[in-house]
Amino acid sequence: MIYGIGTDLVDPARIASSLERYGEQFARRVLADSEWPDYLEHIKPALFLAKRFAAKEAFSKATGTGLRAPVMFGNMAVQHDSQGKPYFEFQQELAEWIGQRGITRHHLSISDELTMVSAFVVLEK
């Protein structure tokens, strides 16, 4: 059964502007610690951040809470399986919160073009 769905659109240029203005501080607000090494190695850091930002916003919308504790950027990380499929890893606090709501599976899709990044999340009970 579907618990919730969420979607988000992000303009990578807006993320690039935030990076120029706030630098590493902005990136640290968006990324979980486990995402930091991949960010540092990425040839397009603004695009990397835009994808994470969109995915995490879409997840927050699927929960129905928006971004409020424990559904926070730092409590979730976007990873990829061996085939390149994206998925979330959750910090313990958020994982417990998800379990309390009976959410058993999640699905994440991320797409990007030159001027837009989109993410779509489905949560199942």
Curated annotation (Swiss-Prot):
Pfam families: ACPS (PF01648). One of its GO terms (cellular component) is cytoplasm. GO terms for biological process: fatty acid biosynthetic process. InterPro entries: 4-PPantetheinyl_Trfase_dom, 4-PPantetheinyl_Trfase_dom_sf, ACPS, Ppantetheine-prot_Trfase_dom. Its EC number is 2.7.8.7. The keyword Cytoplasm applies. SUPFAM superfamilies: 4'-phosphopantetheinyl transferase. Its cofactor is Mg(2+). It comes from the Bacteria. GO terms for molecular function: holo-[acyl-carrier-protein] synthase activity; magnesium ion binding. It is found in: Cytoplasm. Belongs to the P-Pant transferase superfamily. AcpS family. Transfers the 4'-phosphopantetheine moiety from coenzyme A to a Ser of acyl-carrier-protein. This is Holo-[acyl-carrier-protein] synthase. It comes from Nitrosomonas europaea (strain ATCC 19718 / CIP 103999 / KCTC 2705 / NBRC 14298).
